[in-house]
Design a protein with these regions (language model features):
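Regulatory input/activation interfaces that engage signals or partners
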Residues: 83
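Short, well-ordered, aromatic-rich surface patches in folded extracellular/luminal domains
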Residues: 75-78, 87
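Short S/T/G/P-rich N-terminal loop/turn motif that feeds into the first structured element of a domain
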Residues: 1-57, 61-71, 87-220
Length: 220
């Protein structure tokens, strides 16, 4: 059965109270306590200079599990109040990066890191036909950096799908691919750098990078 790997990435309203931000953080970190369909839920605060502040990463066993999550009462009663444009309790903002919901399909939890590890998330728009070329670059980057303990490159299928996570409604999206990198520490993730960009050249048309420590609601 094909799993769905998913990210929600937000900029926070500077006027939002710390109490509300903390409440959203806790509700997303501990999502699997309230919505059984949610797997491997973790949150993080972005430490890069990209003005995106909050990342919620998680997964679903199947598209059907994801669809049940979307109509769960906890989603409507708790998450939507923090996120929806028409909610008076909204604490996130629109951002100039055209980033919000991203993700991909996989056959197993190939993305999984232990709690307390760090993620470096590279969002890319690759030129047409360059995915295999760039995949070789990711493999080379991992071979050169022993601190890069996990590397996954995948097409951002969530960016072009409807709310069911399956039905394609757009031909393209701003970031065509996601490169997940895993490190044992935030310091290692921050120090990893982007030397790979020189090799990628024109194959990469657009890119932003985020890194954060995993505050995980799951056990290793």
């Amino acid at each position: 059965m094909t799993m769905l790997r998913r990210f929600e990435i937000y900029s926070l309203d500077p006027k939002a109270s710390q109490a509300k931000v903390a409440a959203m953080h806790a509700s997303m970190r501990n999502a699997q306590r309230y919505i059984p369909e949610v797997l491997h839920s973790a949150v993080g605060r972005n430490e890069s200079d990209v003005a995106l502040h909050f990342v919620w990463e998680h997964a679903y066993e199947s598209a059907q599990s994801y669809q049940r999550y979307k109509v769960h009462a906890f989603h409507a009663n708790i998450y939507d109040r923090y996120l929806l444009n028409d909610s008076p309790e909204r604490i996130v903002t629109d951002n100039p990066y055209d980033v919000g919901l991203l993700g991909y399909s996989c056959e197993a939890p190939i993305y999984l890191l232990p709690p307390g590890a760090a993620r470096r998330l590279v969002l890319l728009r690759l030129a047409e036909g360059q995915a295999d070329f760039f995949r070789a670059i990711t493999a080379e980057a991992q071979s050169r950096n022993p601190q890069l303990i996990l590397s996954v490159l995948a097409e951002n299928t969530f960016g072009t799908r409807w709310l069911d996570g399956v039905t394609q409604i757009l031909e393209t999206t701003t970031y065509s691919h996601i490169w997940e990198q895993g490190y044992e520490s935030l310091a290692a993730a921050a120090a990893a750098g982007s030397d790979w960009r020189a090799s990628a050249g024109a194959a990469v048309e657009k890119v932003i990078e985020l890194w954060y420590e995993l505050d995980a609601g799951y056990e290793e």
